[in-house]
Amino acid sequence: MTIDINGNQEDISAMLIGAERYALGRRTYIVQWTCEFIGNNLHLLTEKDKGVMIRDIEGAIDYGDECDEACWKALLSKLKGV
């Protein structure tokens, strides 16, 4: 199902930053869900916010469990275009 969202790219991009920051370091299902959603919707991020996410993920003190770290590193690669 496709949905329409009221707002502009900057609004959506900022909300995705909030989701990333909420999930970073947690040890729950939300990590995988967040990483997959952001990774599959990179077109919704501004270039500035991609840079913010890269900085957040690279500077994380704790990624959570090993499976969470793998999710974050996979998202980081996507954000960097690797």
Please tell me what each predicted stretch does.
Residues M1-V31, C35:
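Short terminal alpha-helical segments
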Residues R21-Y29, L42-K50, D62-A70:
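Charged, low-complexity interaction regions
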Residues C35-L42, E58:
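Amphipathic alpha-helical segments within well-ordered protein domains
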Residues D56-V82:
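Amphipathic alpha-helical binding modules
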Residues G7, E36-F37, V52, I61-G64:
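Short linear motifs centered on Gly/Pro in flexible linkers and helix caps
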Residues G7-M15, L45-I57:
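Short amphipathic alpha-helical heptad-repeat segments
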